């Protein structure tokens, strides 16, 4: 064999290998970026969330989305479909910033006619710079540029881990996956023994940072709201946005008090709600003053994360119009409940519930 023949053979084999790899990834498509999986169970886990969300947002059939952090991961779209109508999917980003959540909304609105957004608001998510993601997002899966998908085609994890997982489940299906994806509710221990060990309470009164007389959004919050919330609300007047504030345990609010930022956080929350309520296509629900939930540590695995039963209960409550905020007086009343419960905890110097 001559050098030219050897070179031609080598190049042909190389081209065949490259083409075969691209074809294999594109056809099997473990993250459903090009088409929804029908011949196997896609490897959708909390660890693949930002990859899986790209395919779900692009190629699943839906008209409603769940947006938010781990506080939203235990929602069951089948229940939401029954309560609100339509077809829900979850586009959650565990620990996401408001920019991360904005990216999910952007892809959903650019590919589907979205009639309803259920959005769980964590104030922490608005403390980041409005263009800052809290996770490294595979942006090449979120755009329409096919050429940069080379990072997907030749991804070592895709080739060595996720394609084999797909092949293992070849011929199988999981009709419940739309509910079970990202769901962690059954994986942890709940109750005082899980939440309280090692935690020390104090009767010491902590001076709170001055929040000002009138609730006003901080500059950081303003930028997040202006860039990551309002454009979608204003550009999609026929879409119903259902924002809710998750029911963190009372211990979480006590920690905020210990840090001296309780009043600041409550004022930021009130100012944010007042901005959102100015829009006709927005509903706001506040579950943070639900004493029957937040004082019962059997609902929690830590200071914030509650069971799937609470997600189910929130869905039922929203469908019934319960805990809906319609004005400033109601916000202040809810905040007063939190203040009072924290005061009880400080006075007791131990968990009194």
Regions found by a protein language model. Give the residues of each.
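Secreted/periplasmic serine-hydrolase-like ester/acetyl group-modifying domain
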Residues: 121, 130, 134-235, 239, ...
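C-terminal regions of proteins
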Residues: 270-353
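Hydrophobic membrane-insertion alpha-helices, especially the h-region
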Residues: 8-26
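Extended hydrophobic/aromatic segments used for targeting, binding, or gating
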Residues: 233, 238-241, 249-297
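Membrane-embedded segments
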Residues: 71-153
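Loop/turn elements at helix/coil->beta-strand transitions in domains of secreted/extracellular proteins
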Residues: 61-63, 86-87, 113-116, 236-241, ...
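Short loop/turn segments at strand-loop or loop-helix junctions that form parts
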Residues: 120-124, 198-204, 243-249, 287-290
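Membrane/wall-proximal cationic-aromatic binding patches
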Residues: 28-90, 96-107
């Amino acid at each position: 064999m001559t050098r030219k023949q050897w070179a031609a053979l080598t190049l042909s084999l190389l081209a065949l290998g490259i083409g075969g790899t691209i074809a294999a990834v594109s056809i099997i498509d473990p993250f459903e970026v090009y088409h929804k999986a029908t011949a196997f169970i896609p490897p959708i886990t909390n660890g693949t969330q930002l990859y899986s969300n790209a395919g779900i947002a692009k190629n699943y059939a839906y008209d409603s989305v769940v947006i938010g952090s781990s506080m939203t991961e235990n929602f069951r779209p089948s229940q939401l479909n029954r309560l609100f109508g339509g077809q829900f999917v979850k586009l959650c980003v565990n620990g996401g910033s408001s920019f991360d959540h904005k990216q999910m909304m952007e892809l959903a609105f650019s590919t589907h006619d979205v009639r309803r957004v259920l959005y769980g608001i964590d104030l922490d998510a608005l403390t980041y710079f409005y263009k800052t993601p809290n996770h490294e997002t595979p942006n090449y899966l979120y755009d329409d540029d096919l050429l940069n998908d080379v990072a997907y085609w030749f991804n070592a994890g895709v080739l060595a881990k996720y394609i084999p997982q797909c092949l293992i489940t070849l011929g199988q299906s999981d009709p419940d996956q739309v509910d079970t994806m990202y769901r962690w509710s059954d994986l942890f221990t709940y109750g005082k023994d899980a939440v309280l060990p090692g935690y020390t309470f104090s009767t010491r009164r902590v001076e709170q940072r001055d929040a000002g007389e009138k609730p006003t959004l901080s500059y950081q919050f303003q930028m997040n709201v202006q860039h990551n919330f309002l454009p979608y609300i204003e550009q999609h007047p026929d879409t119903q946005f259902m924002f809710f504030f998750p029911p963190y345990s009372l211990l979480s609010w006590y920690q905020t008090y210990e840090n001296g930022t309780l009043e600041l956080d409550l004022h930021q929350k009130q100012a944010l709600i007042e901005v959102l309520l100015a829009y006709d296509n927005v509903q706001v629900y506040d579950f943070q003053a639900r004493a029957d939930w937040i004082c019962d540590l059997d609902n929690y695995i830590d200071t914030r994360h509650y069971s799937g039963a609470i997600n189910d209960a929130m869905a039922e409550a929203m469908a019934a119009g319960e805990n809906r905020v319609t004005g400033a007086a109601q916000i202040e009343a809810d905040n007063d409940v939190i203040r009072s419960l924290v005061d009880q905890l400080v006075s007791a110097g131990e968990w009194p519930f």
